[in-house]
């Protein structure tokens, strides 16, 4: 009587493990890049949410300001107007934000720095939103101090 084989041979198991290893080696870097891009896009979205408040303040002739932390002390009193974000954001991705009036009336530059819990490849990157007096917004993302920065992390709608 012939014996029926039960289970797998050692070579079959080794081939399966090799295939899993190859797939993991390809998938892990792609997943890390996906996480980095989604975090940059989320931080951009958090910053872009203040654009309407900034435009409203500029339209009313006020100076848009970020709510200062207790140590900074810049008051959001007329002619300043708070635009809904702190200079030390409570976001777990943005570690710092600055809102600076430009040289011309109505110009403003809003810069956010990725830090805190951002992926290590984007930690220290900056997102800059700039508004001109005509109300036109531009966006730029720079590596800053991020060591693993890739241009594919820039969100759509941002140059």
Swiss-Prot record:
InterPro entries recorded: N_methyl_site, Pilin, Pilin-like, T4P/T2SS_Core
Residues recorded with modification N-methylphenylalanine: 8
Protein's cellular compartments: Fimbrium; Membrane
PROSITE patterns: PROKAR_NTER_METHYL
Membrane topology: Single-pass membrane protein
GO CC, alphabetical: membrane; pilus
Pfam families on file: N_methyl (PF07963), Pilin (PF00114)
Disulfide bridges in this chain: 139-158
Transmembrane segments: 8-30
GO biological process: cell adhesion
Residue span(s) of the pro-peptide: 1-7
Keyword Membrane: yes
Alphabetized UniProt keyword annotations: Disulfide bond, Fimbrium, Membrane, Methylation, Transmembrane, Transmembrane helix
Coiled-coil annotated spans: none
Family statement drawn from the similarity comment of this UniProt entry: Belongs to the N-Me-Phe pilin family.
Name of the featured protein: Fimbrial protein EcpA
Originating species: Eikenella corrodens
Gene responsible for this protein: ecpA
